[in-house]
Amino acid sequence: MKFTRMLVLASTSLLATVATSQAQEVKRDTKKQGEVVLKPITIISHGKDNIEATGGTVLTYKDIEKLQPANVSELFSRQSSIAVSGGGGPSKRIHVLGMEQSNLAVSVDGVPQTATSWHHTGSNVIDPAFLKRVEVEAGAAAADSGFGAAAGAIRYETVNALDLLEPGKTFGARIIGSYGTNGRGFSGSTAAYGLKDGFDWLLMLHGTSGHNYKNGDGTEILGTEPAARNILGKAGYEFDGNRIDIGYERSRDKADRLIKMNMGLPGDTEYPLEVARDSVNIKYTRTDATDMWDPEVQFYYNRNDYWRNDYQNRTNGNMILKEDLYGGKLQNTFTIDYGKITAGIDFGKHDYNTDNYGHNDRRYRKFNTQQVGAFTQGRFEFDNGFSLSTGARYDYSRFADWNDEVFSDSGASVNGTLSYKFNEHIEVFAGASRTWLGYVLGDYGYVHARNNAFYTDPTFSPGRARNYKAGVNFGGADWSAGITLFDTRIAGLPNYDSQKLGNDPEEYRSRGFTLNARYIWNYTTIGATFTKAKVTAGDDPVLPNSGSFMPIGDMATLFIDQEIPDYNMKVGATLAWAGRISDEAATAANFYDQPAYTVVNAYAEWNPPAVKNMTLRVGVENLFNENYYERTSFAPSQNRGGIDAVWAPGRTFTFQTAFKF
């Protein structure tokens, strides 16, 4: 679609008469412990989108504290729309509605992240120990969510000193130590933070050391030992209405892993592997922002490395991947009578380097992509009960391949979400987007196994996506529920065949619906989610081969949290269920049916009255020792002499002690 037509569509949506809606937010009254007060939230509230009201997921700091996740599987264990495949930390892949997170605009503290480099590596980009908030905006994403938001956006936000300091204090520290059975081993997290004369700072360290775990049948799963060594550092300074934030994150995972971490091959062995990530960013904002001047300026640098050196087998071979991503964003938010408008530009350059296996006649390859974009997003609440979030962006994309061939193009994207509130208990909404993705390189790890003749098809073109969603939310004084229908289509993705890089001819699609419900009564919270999704490539179901699109079928979660204030205790449990998947396409490709499974996790937490700054916790994952592999894992098949899944851990107990000073 031409840019002028897209601009007309965006302008039309900005002028449309549309509806506002409400969801329910839980807010604890500090005057009476345990009393719950619910206040309405519209889809647009104070110029911000309410992600949950349109079928998305939000994990707050309190949610993360309840879960105390050791990995991203546990982080998203209560979300049926998000599936995480199993294995060691670097192998975990996150899929939203069956679409791997590389299809979403992923950021950490506002910094764009690199896509998954290889279909046998994981997609997690952040240590859960550092997190304070996660937003998963599934489907139509806002224009200021970033470039390439084909299927939505995932925003991870890490803690800072102001989040952890006790009221009235200028220095604090936190120490968390745990021991887990079934190979989990020891985990330790230490943080120090302070505030003085407008300067705040934080330093946090987290490390794990364990062994390979066993599945529910007692079989050792190779390459799964915990081996994280991570650092988070932050500093902020406020002066004369200005604020500058600087952040650094470093992650290392060095251990013996399977050659292809997400699948078990016949006679498979472990081999030394190191995965590393470094990220630096600096951001400028105003603490005394006005209606017309509320700027945000950010610059960043990311580096991702994958080292598998000197492997002797030519079929798999050496594999060294290096990525450098750097860029920035400049934007301003304008406040008007009915809401806010954010406008700005963003830009980035992504450098790729591959070291092919030793017998290849093209040992090294270097290539890069560049992007520059302009965007605007408006979020409005009207007095008549209507609300609207709509925006557009225009991007230029350039791709220079390993043969110095250059491809360039530009395109526009547009989005809109509207809602209407019938009364204080019912809301309806609908949203849509068309997104221009630029040149998508995706699973570029294939390049490491291509010879000197490998080239880019001269007709290689940018990708594109369409999203549609609609739903209804219900709410009362102590309960809420909702349903969201979704339909996402992505085309123009890359295809690395044996001779060239070209476009995949298939259109990939995920469609279905999600349900959610929550009930709150005094100290008790009960919640449930259900997701049904059909994921296809063209007219056929996608195969369970750990690709960018995976079948998830039917999935559900049920959870409960209970506070027991008389004993300073909290207890809770989560049940996750996945239905059986069987289809003719997978059978024809020699995959076995994927069995159903049900997994229960539980925890208990106690604050001893005599030591108020100490918390003791015991958790159990997979309480009933179910033998299963997580949905979106590489499914077992008869191919290559028999491929096995990387099975999930069996019953695992974790004992944790935390001190806060």
Swiss-Prot record:
Entry-linked CDD domains: ligand_gated_channel
One GO CC annotation: cell outer membrane
Domain of life, source organism: Bacteria
All residue ranges annotated as the TBDR plug domain in the record: 48-159
Any coiled-coil regions, as ranges: none
Bridged cysteine pairs (disulfide): none
Membrane-topology annotation of the record: Multi-pass membrane protein
Subcellular location: Cell outer membrane
Main location: membrane
Pfam families noted in UniProt: Plug (PF07715), TonB_dep_Rec_b-barrel (PF00593)
Induction summary: Induced in absence of iron.
Alphabetized UniProt keyword annotations: Cell outer membrane, Membrane, Receptor, Signal, TonB box, Transmembrane, Transmembrane beta strand, Transport
InterPro entries with a match to the protein in the record: Plug_dom (IPR012910), Plug_dom_sf (IPR037066), TonB-dep_rcpt-like (IPR039426), TonB-dep_rcpt_b-brl (IPR000531), TonB_rcpt_b-brl_sf (IPR036942)
Signal peptide range in chain numbering: 1-23
Domain TBDR beta-barrel: 170-661
One example GO MF annotation: siderophore uptake transmembrane transporter activity
Record family assignment: Belongs to the TonB-dependent receptor family.
Function, as annotated: Heme transporter.
Name of the protein: Heme transporter BhuA
